[in-house]
């Protein structure tokens, strides 16, 4: 399993609304291509880009920006984030 959880922090919700970006905690071994493929398959959307970082806790966090024709807030509603 690549995706562990979707973040629901204040910053993550702001990114969903303002930049069409989902914030996800992923498996440490997952590559950007793996994350992109998983999100596209899971929600039937197109991903514009993926930025990743390792948090201080040692978790891998991914910022997944969707293409303009898709809406991150729709996905957030389906997941119960918004």
Curated annotation (Swiss-Prot):
TM regions (residue ranges): none
Q: Name one GO molecular function term.
A: structural constituent of ribosome
Please give the SUPFAM superfamilies that the UniProt record associates with this protein: Ribosomal proteins S24e, L23 and L15e (SSF54189)
Which GO biological process categories is it annotated with?
A: translation
Q: Which GO terms describe its cellular component?
A: ribonucleoprotein complex; ribosome
Answer yes or no on keyword rRNA-binding.
yes
Task: Answer whether the UniProt record assigns the keyword Nucleotidyltransferase to this protein.
Answer: no
Keywords of this protein's UniProt record, alphabetized?
Ribonucleoprotein, Ribosomal protein, RNA-binding, rRNA-binding
Could you give the subunit structure recorded for this chain? Part of the 50S ribosomal subunit. Contacts protein L29.
What is the role of this chain? Binds to 23S rRNA. One of the proteins that surrounds the polypeptide exit tunnel on the outside of the ribosome.
Hey, which family's this protein in? Belongs to the universal ribosomal protein uL23 family.
PANTHER family assigned to the protein according to its UniProt record, in alphabetical order: 60S RIBOSOMAL PROTEIN L23A (PTHR11620)
Quote the protein name from its UniProt record: Large ribosomal subunit protein uL23
Protein's organism: Sulfurisphaera tokodaii (strain DSM 16993 / JCM 10545 / NBRC 100140 / 7) (Sulfolobus tokodaii)
Q: What does the record give as the organism's lineage?
A: Archaea, Thermoproteota, Thermoprotei, Sulfolobales, Sulfolobaceae
């Amino acid at each position: 399993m690549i995706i562990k959880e979707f973040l629901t922090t204040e910053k993550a919700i702001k990114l969903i609304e303002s930049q069409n970006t989902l914030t996800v905690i992923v498996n440490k071994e997952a590559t950007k291509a793996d994350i992109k493929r998983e999100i596209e398959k899971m929600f039937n959307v197109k991903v514009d880009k993926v930025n990743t970082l390792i948090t201080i806790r040692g978790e891998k966090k991914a910022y997944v920006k969707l293409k303009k024709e898709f809406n991150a807030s729709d996905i957030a509603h389906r997941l119960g984030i918004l």
